[in-house]
Amino acid sequence: MGSFRCMSPASPSWSGLLELLLCGESLSAAQATDLMQAWLSESLTPVQTGAFLAGLRAKGMEAEELAAMAAVLREACPLPCARPDRFLVDTCGTGGDGADTFNISTAVAFTAAACGVEVAKHGNRSASGKVGSADVLEGLGLNLKAPLQLVVDAIPAAGVTFLFAPAWHPALVNLAPLRRSLGVRTVFNLLGPLVNPLKPQAQVLGVAKKDLLDPMAGALQRLGLERAVVVHGAGGLDEASLAGPNDLRFIEAGAIRSLQLSPDELGLATADLETLKGGDLDCNQTILQQVLQGRGEPAQRDVVALNTALVLWAAGIDTDLSSAAARAAEALDQGLPWTRLETLRQHLAS
């Protein structure tokens, strides 16, 4: 009986591309671009789309594929105006760590803004039945249906804004039912943090799996970010953790370097993951409000300060992480991040 051999046709059809994936081969940037454009134009059948999503998930994503697909999605966003001529930073993770923490990266966005960073946070509702950034911010009164122009104008007004992903990526709405029916995480969970339509120059991006550090760092590098940090936290968090050493990739001037960082190196106490637990929507709203007002538990305050320090580095505001963490902790103790959220809420309600 003859053995099956994978073929690599010079100009593969959709079935040819799928065969490449099933054989464990990666797509070129051009092929990844074509595939994403086909998805956006609804040129593929649901069966074909499901097969590609499964094939990419089974193979694993490469930096070149992620960057090519992200570039297509970012260009497809309906911008209400020219991109703001400002140095912007995003704080967004892939999710999927299963740790059920409170909304740490959301707290970080407002804390970084209180420290002088201009933040354009890209986020969505939770896809897992937990509480996503959009869920908790809407619960605290943020208008997710605000006109896109108003969302952009919030940056100079509040120092921070929130880009609700479905409002900026309407072309992906048609794929949502199929993604839900698959019931597993797909490439779109990885693309979410890469497709901020305002194209921030810097970013802190958390990944729940250590083997995603290099592909995501490589994607950010290819997308041309000036400075970025990709972090996989101790205990499997998709953000820096207080539980032990965190694995980091720093991207600066086109180069990537690896680093491990423990909280005690920044003068922060180690803490068990249980101290960072969230709960249902009401619980997470309460925790977020308390943390931003300076009334959070010590571990909640410290984990936000730790992650905010990475944002301050990415923004170029403070390149000494210990000093940056202290600066973030001071802002939290004074309740300054809550003022930023209140200003944003009022702006989006106008």
From Swiss-Prot:
Catalytic activity line of the entry: N-(5-phospho-beta-D-ribosyl)anthranilate + diphosphate = 5-phospho-alpha-D-ribose 1-diphosphate + anthranilate
Cofactor binding note of this UniProt entry: Binds 2 magnesium ions per monomer.
EC number(s) per entry: 2.4.2.18
Pfam family, any one: Glycos_transf_3
Pathway: Amino-acid biosynthesis; L-tryptophan biosynthesis; L-tryptophan from chorismate: step 2/5
Cofactor: Mg(2+)
UniProt KW keywords: Amino-acid biosynthesis, Aromatic amino acid biosynthesis, Glycosyltransferase, Magnesium, Metal-binding, Transferase, Tryptophan biosynthesis
Presence of the UniProt keyword Cell cycle in the record: no
Top-level EC class: transferase
Binding site residues for anthranilate 1: 93, 124
Record-level GO cellular component terms: cytosol
Residues involved in Mg(2+) 2 binding: 238-239
Record's keyword annotation contains NAD: no
Residues at which Mg(2+) 1 binds: 105, 239
One GO MF term: anthranilate phosphoribosyltransferase activity
Residue numbers binding anthranilate 2: 179
Any GO BP: L-tryptophan biosynthetic process
Family matches, as InterPro entries: Anthranilate_Pribosyl_Tfrase (IPR005940), Glycosyl_Trfase_fam3 (IPR000312), Glycosyl_Trfase_fam3_N_dom (IPR017459), Glycosyl_Trfase_fam3_N_dom_sf (IPR036320), Nuc_phospho_transferase (IPR035902)
Alphabetized HAMAP family for the sequence: TrpD
Family the entry assigns: Belongs to the anthranilate phosphoribosyltransferase family.
Subunit structure: Homodimer.
Main function: Catalyzes the transfer of the phosphoribosyl group of 5-phosphorylribose-1-pyrophosphate (PRPP) to anthranilate to yield N-(5'-phosphoribosyl)-anthranilate (PRA).
UniProt-recorded name of the protein: Anthranilate phosphoribosyltransferase
Annotated source species: Parasynechococcus marenigrum (strain WH8102)
Gene: trpD
